[in-house]
Amino acid sequence: MALTKAEMSEYLFDKLGLSKRDAKELVELFFEEIRRALENGEQVKLSGFGNFDLRDKNQRPGRNPKTGEDIPITARRVVTFRPGQKLKSRVENASPKDE
């Protein structure tokens, strides 16, 4: 099971008493700000959670799995996430819930 933006909005509605519309907008604005920062080449640091970074990957050789033909994989920029120590600890110490 995955946590969705809709579930996050519902949680804000329940816990903070925001209207459903405001809760949904808050979640959307939060993620939009992260997207904007990354698009502008900025690192995103969320204290107690982790960091979103941009990494430039060089061109490298690859292979077409269907034909076996050698093809170049073009250089590109990717987003990486490094969890913070607090998040790592909480996940490691959490007991998994039955699905």
From Swiss-Prot:
Its main location: cytoplasm. Pfam families: Bac_DNA_binding. Residues 49-73 are annotated as: Disordered. Keywords: Conjugation, Cytoplasm, DNA recombination, DNA replication, DNA-binding, Transcription, Transcription regulation, Translation regulation. GO terms for cellular component: cytosol; IHF-DNA complex; protein-DNA complex. GO terms for biological process: DNA recombination; DNA replication; DNA-templated transcription; regulation of translation. The keyword Nucleus does not apply. It is found in: Cytoplasm, Nucleoid. InterPro entries: Hist_DNA-bd (IPR000119), Histone-like_DNA-bd_CS (IPR020816), IHF-like_DNA-bd_dom_sf (IPR010992), IHF_alpha (IPR005684). GO terms for molecular function: DNA binding; DNA-binding transcription activator activity; structural constituent of chromatin; transcription cis-regulatory region binding. Disruption phenotype: Increased in vivo levels of ATP-DnaA. One of the 2 subunits of integration host factor (IHF), a specific DNA-binding protein that functions in genetic recombination as well as in transcriptional and translational control. Binds to hundreds of transcriptionally inactive, AT-rich DNA sites, approximately half its binding sites are in non-coding DNA, which only accounts for about 10% of the genome. IHF in combination with the datA locus promotes ATP hydrolysis of ATP-DnaA, called DDAH (datA-dependent DnaA-ATP hydrolysis). Plays a crucial role in the lysogenic life cycle of bacteriophage lambda, as it is required not only in the recombination reaction, which inserts lambda DNA into the E.coli chromosome, but also for the synthesis of int and cI repressor, two phage proteins necessary for DNA insertion and repression, respectively. The synthesis of int and cI proteins is regulated indirectly by IHF via translational control of the lambda cII protein. PANTHER family: DNA-BINDING PROTEIN HU (PTHR33175), INTEGRATION HOST FACTOR SUBUNIT ALPHA (PTHR33175:SF2). Belongs to the bacterial histone-like protein family. Heterodimer of an alpha and a beta chain. Part of the relaxosome, a complex composed of plasmid-encoded TraI, TraM, TraY and host-encoded IHF bound to the F plasmid origin of transfer (oriT). This is Integration host factor subunit alpha. It comes from Escherichia coli (strain K12). The lineage of its organism: Bacteria, Pseudomonadati, Pseudomonadota, Gammaproteobacteria, Enterobacterales. The gene is ihfA.
